[in-house]
């Protein structure tokens, strides 16, 4: 955990970047920073595995590409449902905007963020807690820690932290059920990418340029305001409902069993 402190500090620095007042070549700077964070995360993981003589699978690091794609579709669904509800009830109006090349940068930027945060939150923290505590306690504590990672973000709200914590619990549950962070990475990536690069909403307090330009027609309590969809009471309710459904009807929704993972794993 101590070894990850520099990684988390850099992560906070990156998300505190003012994306509307970008200096020259900001994408190169940000991608390079994220790449450095990713390398640092992989290095700490290597030290952990090597030093403690563990397998990557003990940290839920098992590449399962089908699960990854399912997770991406799952994360996309969250934002589509949010868009449909807010558009239908006149809460947010989504208008097409001019296409920006920023879209391509965000594609890789949010992918790296998803990989880094899932390795740290679910791969390391959840797996460590799982060794000593029950599934519920491990999920609860790791998801709260995941939420607190975003405490220093701009425009943070109680609802925003609650939604992020609930989503962390969901991704942790998915990780325990599949034995891999693959689906959680896909979900995490789509959650941020679709929210920011497509819908044009802020992502955890950071301004984004998307394919759509959202116009807020209601209070921040419903729109999420400057924090993004996570700051919306609507998204919090959606996340909690989906979490309950996934817990109750896992096999019917995903058709994935823990015992099947050895057949799908590609290490």
Regions found by a protein language model. Give the residues of each.
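Small-polar-interrupted transmembrane alpha-helices in polytopic inner-membrane proteins
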Residues: 79-80, 110, 114, 134-151, ...
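Functionally important transmembrane alpha-helices
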Residues: 5-9, 160-220
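Hydrophobic core of alpha-helical transmembrane segments in multi-pass integral membrane proteins
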Residues: 1-8, 38-46, 76-84, 235-250
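C-terminal membrane module of polytopic membrane proteins
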Residues: 194-267
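Hydrophobic alpha-helical transmembrane segments
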Residues: 31, 68-73, 103-107, 136-141, ...
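Membrane-embedded alpha-helical segments of multi-pass membrane proteins
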Residues: 32-43, 103-108, 116, 120, ...
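Juxtamembrane helix-loop-helix connectors linking adjacent transmembrane helices
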Residues: 8-31, 49-119, 126-131, 259, ...
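Membrane-interface helix/loop boundary segments of multi-pass membrane proteins
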Residues: 116-141, 145, 173-180
């Amino acid at each position: 955990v101590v070894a990850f402190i520099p990684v988390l500090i850099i992560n906070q620095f990156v998300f505190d970047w003012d994306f509307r007042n970008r200096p020259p070549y900001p994408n190169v700077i940000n991608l390079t920073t994220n790449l450095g964070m990713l390398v640092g995360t992989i290095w700490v993981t290597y030290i952990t595995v090597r030093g403690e003589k563990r397998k990557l699978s003990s940290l839920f690091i098992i590449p399962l590409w089908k699960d990854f794609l399912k997770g991406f579709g799952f994360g996309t669904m969250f934002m589509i449902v949010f868009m449909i509800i807010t558009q239908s009830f006149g809460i947010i109006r989504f208008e097409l905007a001019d296409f920006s090349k920023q879209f391509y940068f965000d594609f890789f930027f949010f992918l790296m963020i998803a990989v880094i945060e899932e390795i740290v939150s679910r791969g390391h923290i959840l797996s460590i807690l799982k060794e000593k505590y029950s599934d519920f306690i491990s999920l609860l504590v790791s998801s709260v820690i995941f939420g607190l990672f975003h405490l220093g973000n701009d425009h943070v709200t109680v609802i925003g932290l609650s939604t992020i914590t609930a989503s962390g619990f969901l991704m942790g549950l998915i990780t325990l059920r599949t034995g891999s962070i693959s689906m959680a990475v896909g979900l995490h990536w789509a959650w941020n990418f679709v929210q920011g690069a497509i819908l044009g909403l802020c992502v955890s307090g950071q301004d984004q340029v998307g394919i759509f330009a959202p116009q807020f027609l209601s209070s921040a309590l419903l729109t999420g305001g400057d924090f993004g969809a996570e700051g919306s009471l609507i998204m919090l309710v959606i996340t909690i409902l989906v979490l309950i459904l996934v817990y109750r009807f896992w096999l019917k929704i995903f058709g994935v069993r823990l015992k099947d993972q050895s057949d799908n794993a590609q290490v």
